[in-house]
Amino acid sequence: IYIPYLGSDSNHHSNMSEKKLFLLDGHALVYRAHFAFITRPLINSKGMNTSAITGFVRTLWDIIKNEKPTHIAVAFDPKGETFRHEYFPEYKAGRDATPEDITNAFPWIHKIVEGFDIPIVSIPTYEADDAIGTLAKQAEKEGFKVYMVTPDKDYAQLVSENIFMYKPSRQGNGVDILGVPEVLEKWGIKRVDQVI
C-alpha cells in the first residue's frame, strides 16, 4: 500500500528509514464528518449536503500534508452483511438507517480517494475495522509504524509499541495519538486487550 509523492515538499522523503502506514477507517470518518456539521450543514450550489465529503477530505489532506505517510490506505465497510451476521443474526439490528446524505457522499469520497491514487480496502463480509486490524498487525511485523485513523475507541485494543490510534482533531483541538501508555491511562486499565 503505497502513496505516491504528493506536493513539492523536499522533506517528504527525508526520513525513509521510518515506514509510516496510515490506515483510515473510511466509514467512521465519514459519519464523524457528517455529524460534525449537523447543525450547520455544508450545502453546495446544487443543493447537495457536502459535509461528509468536506470533513473527510480535510482529514485526509491534513494527514498527507502534516504526517507525510510513506504508505496509506482507506478501508470501507463492504455492502451487505458481515461474517458476524452468521453467528449473531441480530448484529447491528438496532442501528438507525444510514442518513441519505451519507449514502450520497460515498461515491464522491471513493472518487476522491482514487484521485489521490490511494488504495481502497473493502473485503466482502469483513468490516473496515477487521481489515485495518489485520493490516496493522501485518505491517507491524514488516517494520512499519502504523496509525489507525479513526474516532472509534474499539481500535484501542490493537494498540502496541508500533501501532497507534490516530484520532483526527475536532473543532481545532488538535490530533490525539494514542499509544499503549495513553490507552491504559485513558481507560484506567492494565492491558490494551481489556478495551472491549
Question: Regions from the language model: what does each represent?
Answer:
Residues S17-E18, T39-I43, A93-I196:
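Extended two-metal-dependent nuclease catalytic cores across DNA- and RNA-processing enzymes
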Residues G26-H27, A75-P78, T150-K153, S169:
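A short beta-strand-to-loop transition that corresponds to the Sensor-1 phosphate-sensing loop
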Residues M16-A73, D77, F83-F88:
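Non-catalytic, usually N-terminal nucleic-acid engagement modules in DNA/RNA processing proteins
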Residues H12-S14:
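Low-complexity, intrinsically disordered segments with a bias for serine/threonine
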Residues I1-Y2:
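Compositionally biased low-complexity segments enriched in histidine and/or tyrosine
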